[in-house]
Design a protein with these regions (language model features):
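Periplasmic-binding protein-like
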Residues: 357-366, 385-387, 475-485, 505-513, ...
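Short, well-structured alpha-helical segments in soluble
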Residues: 343-359, 463-475
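Extracytoplasmic "Venus flytrap"
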Residues: 301-320, 324, 337-343, 431-435
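Hydrophobic alpha-helical segments within soluble ligand-binding/sensing domains
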Residues: 399-421, 512-533
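Short, charged/polar connector segments at secondary-structure boundaries
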Residues: 1-119, 123, 129-130, 175-188, ...
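Segments of small-molecule ligand-sensing domains
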Residues: 529-655
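An alpha-beta-alpha
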Residues: 321, 409-449, 539-559
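Flexible loop/hinge segments that line or gate small-molecule binding clefts
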Residues: 377-400
């Protein structure tokens, strides 16, 4: 490169610096490079570790170690000083050297929280950034902050754990647990090192994802390229992604854009507690329609994990499907697919339903969420809903019911009917909402008998004695059993029942899922335009329908043998809960450790109920963790367990 050419390049770089300087001043921000020494004044440092020579992504070099050179550079590392200065002459010389033979001398810098601050070699970095180089070699010293429980420090400590395995700084994330998930997605064990080939493959894919993400405006979002790459690896194999063309990669990211936006939120799920109101057509829209007309005929598909003959759960949803046929006769056509197995035929069955013309697809098991998400990405005009809770995927919607409302009422019935102060409770999985169900039942029982105690037994634990045998031996005669009949078990052994002398079971009451009402509400919302109005919205959060008794999708069936006074109490409670006049959790709640969880002056918010992970002091028993469960129960916990997000990556669910 000729000197005159290098002088011209300096002038261009200086203009970039001056532009950045003006923009930062306009927005009240510092126009200079951040200084690590200033940053560390308010940081407790654990230690400093020499890392030796490291290939540093140039975009992660963000500042200087000391304040000595800050006035020479704008915050984008472009030069600010006059061309005729000694600084300008050295920059020009480095520019010529870079173009002619490359800058070979490593810089000296400090790394703090994944960002690099230059001690020696600022001008080299400036030249390399100007020419948009990908990386720079540096002799690095790592500054380790003292551990605390902030998400940023937790994530950084996680990175430090995995850095010896992955040996790259380029992959950055915003969510704790991401490095472990990446390790799993790469097919590696928790402590298995990457090969050079592994690193080359993932960094090549990273570069293509970065280009696609940036083209879609991702550089303006909080979610990193690493976040998006990990999202893709949740849905597609490494082989599928590496074979995809740049255009195909961009199409995949574009199709997942709602899910990318959901990554922006610390809480990616918004809960809808009641059906959307019908859309009101404005006068202008009547004269000149602005939005597409609502459909007049719908095809609705149901994908079930099992059959009605082998699963009462599937039978209940099928009963709801037939309600659609009768309520929307001539407007809605429904069809069902059975025995959908994740990883085998689930994706194919959903694709078959869509090929058959399905406008709406309901998948009725949490295990089908991965297949649902992949189909939603491939068919963005098809409305796909999965029966589950707290799934952070905005491309689909999820749905379940507020069972705790019904459990509160059956708890009051149990408290009134129990001959002693002890009542049995059988729970299946420690999933989202289940501790709330148990506590609501206990609070209902305590409302009519302040001495009531709930004996909790789980069906998901290994080598457990039959709960009914335990209750009978302890003299417990009223039990809240499973919420639906189970093949091979007595028909009466669900809901809340009384154990009579001789072991005869008498129904008292049971929670009832009116799935037909839910499906009817969803179809109505599509036909009248309400579906669009209750979309996740501009914040990009996933929608979880969590409807209760006020929507008609949840109820309590009372036995005809229930004493009339107790039935009268149950109806009063049902009316109060449905009208919103009675809140099961609007009372003083103390947990098993004596901690007051609610003073009683107000109820609990939705997040507190969904994520409840404690038992109130009226309950005798514990909430099992993942490692306590049977092998058969663990897949459900991976999907819906209350501490699902705390599982190590190797134990997380595979979509």
């Amino acid at each position: 490169m000729l000197r005159n050419e290098a002088l011209e390049e300096y002038g261009k770089a200086q203009k970039l610096g001056q532009k950045d300087y003006r923009e930062k001043m306009l927005h009240g921000q510092s126009p200079f490079l951040p200084v690590l020494d200033d940053i560390l004044q308010n940081v407790q440092v654990e230690n400093q570790l020499p890392l030796g020579l490291v290939e540093i992504p140039i975009k992660l070099v963000v500042g200087t170690k000391t304040a000595g050179r800050t006035a020479a550079f704008a915050s984008n590392f472009m030069p600010l000083l006059d061309l005729n200065s000694e600084f300008g002459s050295k920059w020009v010389a480095l520019c010529m050297a870079h173009v002619d033979e490359g800058i070979r001398d490593p810089i000296r810098c400090f790394e703090y929280m994944g960002r690099f601050y230059v001690q020696e070699g600022n001008k080299r970095v400036s030249v390399l950034k100007y020419f948009e180089a990908g990386s720079v070699t540096g002799n690095v010293t790592r500054v380790v902050p003292k551990y605390n429980d902030t998400p940023e420090v937790r994530l950084y400590y996680e990175f430090m754990h995995y850095y010896p395995l992955i040996q790259t700084y380029l992959l950055t994330f915003t969510k704790p647990g991401s490095y472990g998930r990446l390790q799993k997605a790469m097919g590696k064990g928790p402590e298995e090192k990457w090969t050079a080939e592994d690193r080359a493959a993932i960094l090549s894919l990273y570069n293509w994802v970065e280009k696609a993400y940036t083209a879609l405006g991702g550089d303006k979002l909080r979610a990193t390229v690493g976040d998006v790459l990990l999202l893709l690896l949740r849905l597609y194999s490494m082989e599928e992604l590496t074979k995809a063309s740049p255009n195909e990669l961009q199409q995949k990211i574009d199709a997942l854009w709602d899910d990318v936006l959901a990554l922006q939120n610390d809480d990616p799920v918004t809960v809808s507690e009641k059906p959307a109101e019908p859309a009101q057509t404005k006068l202008l829209e009547r004269i000149l329609p602005i939005h597409p007309a609502a459909p007049t005929h719908l095809k609705v598909a149901f994908i079930h994990e099992r059959t009605p003959e082998t699963s009462s759960w599937t039978s209940q949803h099928e009963f709801g499907r037939t309600q659609l046929d009768s309520v929307f006769e001539g407007k809605v056509e429904t069809f069902a697919y059975f025995n959908a197995v994740p990883g085998r035929n689930a994706d194919l069955l959903i694709e078959a339903a869509i090929s058959h013309g399905a406008d709406i697809v309901f998948t009725t098991s949490p295990k089908l969420v991965g297949a649902s998400l992949r189909s939603a990405v491939n068919h963005p005009t098809v409305r796909i809903l999965n029966c589950s809770m707290e799934m952070p995927y905005a491309s689909i919607r999820t749905y379940y019911t507020r069972v705790y409302e019904a459990k509160f009422i059956t708890g009051a019935i149990a408290g009134a009917m129990a001959g002693t102060d002890r009542i049995g409770y059988v729970a299946d999985y420690p999933s989202f909402g289940v501790p709330a169900n148990i506590n609501a039942f206990a609070l209902g029982a305590r409302m009519v008998n302040p001495r009531a105690r709930i004996e909790l037994r789980w069906t998901c634990l290994p080598d457990q004695e039959d709960p009914l045998a335990v209750f009978t031996r302890k003299g417990i005669t009223v039990v809240s059993g499973r919420d639906a009949p189970v093949p091979g078990r007595p028909q009466q052994e669900f809901g809340t029942f009384l154990i009579r002398p001789g072991g005869v079971l008498q129904d008292l009451a049971t929670p009832f899922w009116h799935w037909g009402q839910f499906y009817e509400n969803v179809v109505h919302s599509v036909l009248d335009g309400g579906w669009v109005r209750d979309k996740s919205g501009t914040d990009g959060r996933a929608v979880n329908y969590w409807w209760g008794m006020n929507s008609g999708v949840m109820d309590v069936l009372l036995s005809r043998e229930l004493p009339s006074d107790v039935a009268h109490l149950a109806r009063i409670l049902r009316t109060g809960v449905t009208a919103g006049m009675i809140d099961p959790f609007a009372c003083r709640i103390t947990d098993q450790n004596g901690t007051v969880r609610n003073s009683g002056r107000h109820g609990l918010d939705v997040e507190q109920i969904v994520h409840m992970d404690y038992l109130c002091d009226a309950v005798d028993g514990t909430i099992p963790e993942y490692d306590d469960l049977t092998e058969q129960a663990r897949p459900m916990y991976r999907m819906q367990g209350i501490h699902r997000d705390q599982l190590p990556a190797e134990k997380e669910a595979t979509l």
